[in-house]
Amino acid sequence: MKNKLDLSLYLVATKGNKSEECFLNTLENAIKGGVSIIQLREKELNAREFYKLGLKVQKLCKSYKIPFLINDRVDIALALDADGVHLGQEDLEAKLARKLLGDEKIIGLSLKKLEQLEFIQGVNYLGCGAIKATPTKESSLLSLELLSQICDKSPIGVVAIGGIDKEALVELKGINLSGVAVVRAIMDAKDAFLAAKELKRKIYENLSLK
């Protein structure tokens, strides 16, 4: 699967205050609108709750034949036999995650410094940001200049993340990205299908999709 990875519209999904039914409906509508990959990110759930929710999201992703990744938790990814995992700089090292998960799984890594490109062995794609201020990353922004430098020097695909909406996509034009990752632009939208569809249109208009 990793050789055919479509990162164009990457959804980082968190259940939040939604009911499980509403959450799953939102994801399904987002997939129908053009989401190409889903990462389940649940910082507040315990391992059992995360696993149970993961089973349902995984089933949905399988039915639409899109990759399903787990945020941070290599153990949950292994238990689910998920398509892969996305790791932060403070999580298990990517090379160790690769040993545990095997060669066919997808591993993504958060990165925001050029020097971190030296340590991406075993990684399939990079997530870089935040591009815009978000509730959790108000003071941790990545400049567009640095994002562009990372994209130009990275041997693997780069996804921009952090406060990205359809307006922000125009600012990313000309940067050698493989896609964008969104959270609120879809998860908080009144209509996830239309939100995803419009984002996808803007992505194709503005990004080269390396």
Swiss-Prot record:
Record field: catalytic activity: 2-[(2R,5Z)-2-carboxy-4-methylthiazol-5(2H)-ylidene]ethyl phosphate + 4-amino-2-methyl-5-(diphosphooxymethyl)pyrimidine + 2 H(+) = thiamine phosphate + CO2 + diphosphate; 2-(2-carboxy-4-methylthiazol-5-yl)ethyl phosphate + 4-amino-2-methyl-5-(diphosphooxymethyl)pyrimidine + 2 H(+) = thiamine phosphate + CO2 + diphosphate; 4-methyl-5-(2-phosphooxyethyl)-thiazole + 4-amino-2-methyl-5-(diphosphooxymethyl)pyrimidine + H(+) = thiamine phosphate + diphosphate
Binding-site residues for 4-amino-2-methyl-5-(diphosphooxymethyl)pyrimidine, renumbered to this chain: 39-43, 71, 110, 137
EC number of this enzyme: 2.5.1.3
Cofactor note: Binds 1 Mg(2+) ion per subunit.
The organism's place on the tree of life at top rank: Bacteria
InterPro entries xrefs: Aldolase_TIM (IPR013785), ThiamineP_synth_sf (IPR036206), ThiamineP_synth_TenI (IPR022998), TMP_synthase (IPR034291)
Record carries keyword Magnesium: yes
Segments traversing the membrane: none
An MF annotation (GO) of this entry: magnesium ion binding
Described function: Condenses 4-methyl-5-(beta-hydroxyethyl)thiazole monophosphate (THZ-P) and 2-methyl-4-amino-5-hydroxymethyl pyrimidine pyrophosphate (HMP-PP) to form thiamine monophosphate (TMP).
Family the UniProt entry places it in: Belongs to the thiamine-phosphate synthase family.
Name the record gives this protein: Thiamine-phosphate synthase
Organism: Campylobacter jejuni (strain RM1221)
Name of the gene encoding the protein in the UniProt record: thiE
